[in-house]
């Protein structure tokens, strides 16, 4: 059931129905706050709305719960958009991403670490 809700929101985002996706995300309860897929979808909407830094914070929080390739890809894409090509490449590279993410989390004090 929960997966179906998230899949529906993913489809809305891909069909560029961003406002509808935001409404559907807001209907989800607090049990989703630690769900990495929910956080990824939130970040995707933030990215589309050009809220890059909140998207990054949300993605870094998502990594606290589950490491996921698409989360890393979106982080890389955002840093590329922001003009930080070097960090974008590090996050995209599976051999370098761990060090880059740890460094980011230590610099961004609002992100808790396990």
What is each PLM-predicted segment?
Residues 89-114:
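Terminal, low-structured helical/coil segments at or just beyond the last alpha-helical repeat
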Residues 31, 64-65, 97-98:
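Structural marker of alpha-solenoid helical repeat scaffolds
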């Amino acid at each position: 059931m929960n997966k179906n809700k998230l899949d529906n929101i993913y489809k809305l985002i891909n069909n560029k129905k961003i406002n509808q996706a935001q409404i559907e995300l807001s209907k989800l309860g607090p049990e989703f706050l630690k769900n990495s897929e929910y956080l990824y979808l939130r970040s995707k909407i933030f990215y589309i709305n050009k809220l890059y830094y909140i998207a990054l914070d949300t993605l870094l929080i998502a990594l606290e719960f589950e490491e996921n390739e698409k989360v890393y890809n979106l982080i890389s894409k955002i840093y590329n958009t922001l003009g930080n090509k070097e960090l974008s490449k590090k996050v995209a590279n599976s051999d370098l991403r761990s060090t880059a993410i740890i460094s980011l989390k230590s610099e961004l004090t609002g992100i808790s670490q396990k």
